């Protein structure tokens, strides 16, 4: 069976396309074009999942004026299956984030933030299983260390835990206890850094049981997914599609009998007319 995974990251309240003004991204992005592209893919493909990798908000006057509500309403309308938390999602404080998440028709997935003593208590899940055409796809989410990115006033009593350790624990539950055929991490750690800071690449190298990492934070435009060997020598696929909704990531995965999966095509599509 064929399964199509679509994903965005770091959309940053970009509801409109970039203006036609001679700049680098002119005419690209915009929710209407993204929604049309997603709708077209859903009419062509039977098994589609749509994820976001954080930083839904912050970056345009829409957010300054309306506080994130339109962004969440648009994601609801596009029927996102899940998102994870980015640092900028805390910019107006954790109470406001909780208010926005209560509007969402999609789960917010994160396994390495302890939110029990915050307004976000009960508004996130560590992982989620999606069943499509008899196939179990397990998804967990990880977030970046928020220290230095947002203040403790904005995050409240959020407690950060190591994303590699928590991620491996979540992946093990999904793969071995819940018997998922495919395990995906939606991450807001960042693709990679010059310094030895936890990133998607470092997480992949230290991982077990995860097949695909969909990333965000570093606004990295990957033309094709990166393949990294995990600690057992198996390949983990990493993908990220820049920022601002300029691209829509697409991974088409074919599952063969016997549990082997192979990526038949990986297309990071430009969102344009």
Where are these regions (language model features)?
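Acidic, metal/ion-coordinating pockets
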Residues: 1-272
